[in-house]
A protein has these predicted regions:
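Alpha-helix-loop-beta-strand connector modules within alpha/beta enzyme cores
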Residues: 43-66, 101-123
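Conserved alpha/beta-domain cores
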Residues: 16-20, 25-62, 69
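Structural motif
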Residues: 34, 84, 116-117
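Active-site mouth loops of central-metabolism enzymes
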Residues: 6-21, 59-75, 96-102, 125
Length: 125
């Protein structure tokens, strides 16, 4: 596989707490140029990125970075991100629940978020 073909599988990502709009613009321009799968950006930039780069798949994270937010908070983040133009959601799994063996609760959280995103992409990270 050529590197150009590989790009279509890459989520070009900038998730630092200090990421600026200028950095998001650069990221989006690179993703467009290289035809990457998506850009994964902080939710605070989703609406603006979607307005400036409507041709891109915009991904954002919920429950980031620790995953230990409650399910309702993750659902609220998801709803807002979708309303702002996100086409993909990366959900941070609650590793504490996994370590505790709370698999039914983890499964239910994933199910609820998938229900919320519908036919859009949900990735559990």
């Amino acid at each position: 596989m050529k590197k150009e073909e590989l790009y279509r599988f890459v989520d070009h990502t900038a998730l630092k707490a200090v990421t600026t709009w200028k950095e998001i613009q650069q990221l989006c321009q690179e993703a467009r140029f290289f035809r990457m799968a998506s850009v994964c950006i902080p939710s605070s930039y989703v609406k603006r990125a979607h307005e400036y780069f409507p041709e891109l798949n915009i991904c954002t994270v919920v429950g980031f970075p620790l995953g230990n937010a409650n399910t309702e908070a993750k659902l609220m983040e998801t709803r807002q991100a979708l309303a702002d133009g996100a086409s993909e959601i990366d959900m941070v799994i609650n590793l504490g629940m996994v370590k505790n063996g709370q698999y039914p609760q983890v499964t239910e959280e994933i199910r609820l978020l998938k229900q919320e995103v519908g036919d859009k992409i949900l990735k559990v990270i």
